[in-house]
């Protein structure tokens, strides 16, 4: 099977989430890319509103993408876990919290980016910085880059 271009895959995942009216924001390396970094990733990390009805919408969207494992998960299990990983080589990681960041904070402040005609709610620079305060070296490097982007944007 031919590997899809990452932007196409990201747009496809988010298109399905949008069609199901899932409440989510893009976080992680994919969000950093949309803000202008060159961080490589194959994963799509989403921070969701951790309610059972919303988890159902998210799982339904991923199942429609052919991610069969999404059909086997119970929405209440997803809501109880901090992260659920769906996929193998290129995962969709469903977060109910990204370090100490919650959807209740990040959702209303999300910035919409458009990728291949799909609107993608993306965590703000401030919220991405907050989500990266983990103590990991890669996250510390990401914070430096995000702070520089914030400085350049004024």
Predicted regions and their residues:
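Compositionally biased terminal segments of proteins
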Residues: 1-154
């Amino acid at each position: 099977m031919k590997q899809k271009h990452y932007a196409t895959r990201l747009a496809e995942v988010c298109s399905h989430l949008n069609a199901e009216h899932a409440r989510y924001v893009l976080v992680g390396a994919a969000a950093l890319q949309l803000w202008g970094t060159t961080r490589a990733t194959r994963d799509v990390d989403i921070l969701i509103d951790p309610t059972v009805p919303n988890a159902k919408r998210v799982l339904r969207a991923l199942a429609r993408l052919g991610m069969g494992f999404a059909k086997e998960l119970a929405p209440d299990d997803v809501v109880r876990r901090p992260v659920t990983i769906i996929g193998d080589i290129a995962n969709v990681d469903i977060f109910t919290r990204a370090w100490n960041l919650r959807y209740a904070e990040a959702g209303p402040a999300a910035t919409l980016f458009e990728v291949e005609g799909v609107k993608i709610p993306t965590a703000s620079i401030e919220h991405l910085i907050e989500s990266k305060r983990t103590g990991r070296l890669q996250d510390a490097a990401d914070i430096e880059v995000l702070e520089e982007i914030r400085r350049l944007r004024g």
